[in-house]
Amino acid sequence: MASNMRAGSSSTPLVSLVRMTRCDLCDETHQSHLPTLRQLYEEAFPHSERRPWSDLEQLIGEQGAYHFFLLEHPELGVVGFVTLWHFDDFYYGEHFAILPHLRNHRLGEQTLQTIQEYIGREPLYFEVEPETLSEIAGRRINYYERNGFQVVKRDYLQPPYHREEQGVPLYIMSSELGERDFIERVCQTLVDRVYPHF
């Protein structure tokens, strides 16, 4: 069943992480959110930066390193989702999105705080589009920097999610600067464990 983790003081309602499991895919309560979350997933990320939804559901069912979390707010209900991979000594945030009508209400910041409490002292890594790609990409990098992340690798090529596509040039951002060898190992782990091999 879904497990719940909330961060923050009692006076500040923060976003909770509710992990989806194989059972939740068939549970009416959580199943009712799936169409909205699927639409958010497919609208928030370009085709080249997301796996097919059926593959995502399969990963949820496997209960391995992949964690799909509903983001729940005590007053607003489900506000988005985040997907995390947990490896031996770091976490990787694959996808993170807030529902469009709830953006700019500090829910993303609250979610990052909750994630940091959930993962403890292990570093967290994200892929982001280069700021040269668009104004939105630049704002996203600034947003993560304001929340304690920094670009640690600029010459990273995200492997393709789909057989017919090429890799996507992205940056790697992290909650810790880290040694170069460690960052290279993180990138190799992503290539080996996260992305499909065609």
Question: What do these predicted regions represent?
Answer:
Residues 2-7, 15:
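Short amphipathic, helix-prone segments within low-complexity/disordered or flexible regions
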Residues 119-135:
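Conserved GNAT acetyl-CoA-binding A-motif
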Residues 70, 76-85, 90-97:
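Conserved beta-strand in the GNAT
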Residues 12-55, 72, 170, 184-198:
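Short amphipathic alpha-helix that is part of the acyltransferase structural core
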Residues 136-137, 157-198:
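C-terminal "cap" of GNAT-fold acetyltransferases
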Residues 130-154:
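Conserved active-site alpha-helix within GNAT-family acetyltransferase domains
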